[in-house]
Amino acid sequence: MVSLKDSHFDLFHLPAQFALDEAALDAAYRAVQTQVHPDRFAAAGDAQKRIAMQWATRANEAYRTLRDPLKRATYLLSLRGVDIGAENNTAMEPAFLMQQMEWRESIEDAAAARNVDALDALLAELRDEKRARLERLGTLLDSGADQAAAEAVRQLMFIERVASEVGAQIERLET
């Protein structure tokens, strides 16, 4: 029997690894939700309703975490006792810092020129970069290189932020 304190992976009876069968996750989530959905406990007592609500909330949180590769990696690292240190560890490889500066300049230049096509191209580049880095992150996590994986997570978080900024610029220019 799974308890509320077990890992997200245990809740869905999945291996605690980065590579994840999304169809198996979806099926496991639906199975758990079928068992604990509050509607099934409409006629139950308050205590049972409260427990069902806790389980449903727990299942939703676990599903959202495991469904998102970056959240899944962060969670997996936390299970291994590794804090990614996103708030206080901003040290990154010099090459990545240079890439950050280039992306920022591209955003500024394209926004100043009101060039939506350039922003679209940058967004595509960021998506490709994210995809490649997620593959590398999976390799790092599966090989137990947790500190390198933590840095990769921080880099991916930055890439997501930049992509969000690009999206906001595109939206601003198109309105």
Swiss-Prot record:
A GO biological-process term: protein complex oligomerization
Coiled coil: none
Entry keyword annotation includes Chaperone: yes
Cystine bridges: none
Record-linked PROSITE patterns: DNAJ_2 (PS50076)
GO function term, MF aspect, one: protein-folding chaperone binding
Subunit: Interacts with HscA and stimulates its ATPase activity.
Record family assignment: Belongs to the HscB family.
Functional note: Co-chaperone involved in the maturation of iron-sulfur cluster-containing proteins. Seems to help targeting proteins to be folded toward HscA.
Name recorded for this polypeptide: Co-chaperone protein HscB homolog
